[in-house]
């Protein structure tokens, strides 16, 4: 296994009666969290996880960008699942942050996401970004949980992009596309140098774009007030911690 670091996670949690409690948890961050890329998952990387890597060398065929993988955000799962379930979507990276948020918002959608993640032919990969030393971020005091989560998703996309550029062999995928229906998130990602677009923009790159557009939700590329990325309740941390306990990357104390 790889090295382990620790960090203290601070957050506030509401009780059933509405009382706000300050909670501190120590998390353990690892440098061997598998990224799911078939070409790289050997030796030490593979030892950290019992899942077989699924992200292949050819990536997705879509004219939006050269061969690529996509990273999706929470809005895409919540509002565009019908599109996401289309067979043209393969080689999709799902940050742990996204899975946690979806689980807290909609168990039916979370179960549909888990089905995609469990279908190796679809090549969806759950990446534990909250426990990877290279992608885990702290929660800034002046940002909302939702803004923090958006930043975590962008950090995941940025890390994958850097890894592909540095490590990908010839004729291998070298590009990441962040697909988000949040205007602010797309803008910030582009400012950071990432290729980012809305789901509507993205599906125009498929040969069957017309059919996919029929599945598209009207809730695409939404504007939002600053500090309120999704209007989600701020309960995601508990799920994050429980997921970490199950994964063995967070230890109860």
Model feature map: region roles:
Residues 1-253:
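Noncatalytic, typically N-terminal accessory segments of nucleic acid-processing enzymes
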């Amino acid at each position: 296994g790889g090295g382990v670091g620790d960090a203290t996670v601070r957050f506030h949690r509401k009780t059933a009666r509405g009382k706000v409690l300050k909670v501190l948890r120590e998390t353990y961050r690892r440098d061997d969290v598998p990224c799911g890329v078939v070409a790289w998952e050997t030796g030490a990387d593979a030892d950290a996880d019992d899942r077989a890597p699924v992200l292949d060398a050819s990536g997705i065929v879509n004219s939006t960008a050269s061969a690529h993988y996509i990273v999706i955000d929470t809005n895409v799962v919540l509002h565009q699942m019908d599109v996401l379930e289309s067979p043209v979507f393969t080689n999709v990276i799902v940050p742990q942050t996204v899975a946690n948020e979806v689980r807290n918002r909609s168990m039916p959608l979370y179960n549909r996401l888990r089905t995609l993640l469990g279908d190796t032919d679809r090549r969806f990969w759950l990446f534990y970004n909250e426990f990877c030393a290279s992608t885990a971020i702290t929660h800034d005091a002046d940002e909302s949980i939702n803004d923090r989560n958006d930043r975590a998703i962008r950090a995941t996309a940025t890390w994958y992009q850097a890894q592909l550029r540095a490590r990908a062999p010839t004729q291998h995928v070298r590009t990441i596309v962040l697909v988000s229906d949040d205007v602010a998130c797309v803008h910030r990602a582009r400012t950071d140098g990432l290729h980012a677009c809305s789901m509507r923009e993205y599906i125009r790159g498929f040969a069957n774009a017309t059919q996919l557009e029929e599945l598209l939700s009207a809730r695409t590329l939404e504007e939002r007030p600053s500090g309120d990325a999704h209007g989600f309740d701020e309960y995601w941390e508990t799920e994050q911690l429980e997921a970490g306990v199950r994964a063995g990357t967070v230890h109860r104390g």
